[in-house]
Swiss-Prot record:
Binds 1 pyruvoyl group covalently per subunit. This is Arginine decarboxylase proenzyme. It holds the Pfam family AdoMet_dc. Is synthesized initially as an inactive proenzyme. Formation of the active enzyme involves a self-maturation process in which the active site pyruvoyl group is generated from an internal serine residue via an autocatalytic post-translational modification. Two non-identical subunits are generated from the proenzyme in this reaction, and the pyruvate is formed at the N-terminus of the alpha chain, which is derived from the carboxyl end of the proenzyme.
């Protein structure tokens, strides 16, 4: 634990580590019209950020036309990001929700996206990306 000073001048004890939660998955059998709908996907990541208690900074998108084209949407949130990448020709999308902090809920954001895109099937993964206390010395995880 360490003590930090807040912007209002008060002090608070906090755990000295970063909390990182990463929910990501693949969606199969999604209606291609939904996967081509750039504006709809942008609105979806906005809503996902809201229900997950994330503070939205900006939403950007890119549409790639032609065979194997698709849409990529990225929401930059104060806590990290939400992305959706689509391949309408394959009725396929990937979804990535990563948050730093304990107040936001990446699961809720992921679930909303799945509910709205209505895939025939999906696979979801979770990774705890929180930082442990930093080890002293040693070379574990370092490239020499």
């Amino acid at each position: 634990m360490k003590t930090v000073e807040l912007t209002n001048g008060s002090k608070k004890k906090v755990e000295d580590r970063i909390v990182g939660r990463h929910v990501y998955g693949n969606l199969y059998g999604v209606d291609p019209a939904k996967l081509w709908d750039e504006e709809g996907l942008k609105e979806l990541v906005r809503e996902a950020a809201e229900v997950a208690n994330m503070k939205l900074v900006e939403v950007r998108s890119w549409k790639f036309t032609g065979y194997h084209g698709g849409v990529s949407v990225m929401a930059l949130v104060l806590e990290s990001h939400i992305t959706i990448h689509t391949w309408p020709d394959y009725e396929y999308a990937t979804v990535d929700v990563y948050t730093c902090g304990e107040r936001s809920d990446p699961w809720r954001a992921f679930e909303l996206i799945v509910e709205r895109l209505e895939p025939e099937d999906y696979v979801v993964h979770y990774s705890d990306r929180s930082s442990p206390k930093r080890p002293l010395g040693g070379t574990a995880g370092r490239i020499q």
